[in-house]
Regions:
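Terminal targeting signals and extreme-terminal segments of soluble enzymes
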Residues: 1-126
Length: 126
């Protein structure tokens, strides 16, 4: 039997609830731009999938995430949930850029058709 090497990953985040109150007084675009500028911490999910908001304009959001081995499924490729989470995040934030202060949103449905698998060798996904 092959000896397995234990890997570890530390995930750190800031509780998003106190900052979420700011969303009540800022437009969605202002809120996300403040996140990019480091004035508001990224949501905890960003730590899990190495997610970064690259840029936002009205009706558009650009994000990047970098898969690593901690995102693998049992067959040795990145779990589809990683891709679905990235897609859900970027689509939701694109909607958020159009919303006035105090307006919330949520995803009602998400469908993903996969064309090929990802691995940690894929690198940054935008």
């Amino acid at each position: 039997m092959t000896e397995l090497t234990q890997q570890t990953k530390t995930i750190a985040w800031v509780d998003p609830r106190p900052q979420a109150v700011q969303a009540l007084t800022m437009t969605g675009l202002e809120y996300l731009q403040a996140m990019i500028d480091g004035e508001i911490p990224a949501p905890p999910i960003a730590s899990h999938i190495n997610l970064e908001i690259v840029g936002v304009t009205t009706g558009e959001a650009v994000m990047a995430a970098t898969p690593d081995e901690s995102h693998y499924n049992p067959i040795g490729s990145v779990h589809g949930g990683f891709v679905a989470t990235l897609l859900d995040s970027v689509c939701g934030c694109a909607v958020q850029t159009t919303l006035p202060a105090g307006t919330a949103y949520t995803s009602l449905d998400l469908s993903v058709n996969f064309l090929r698998g990802l691995t940690s060798d894929t690198g940054r996904v935008i």
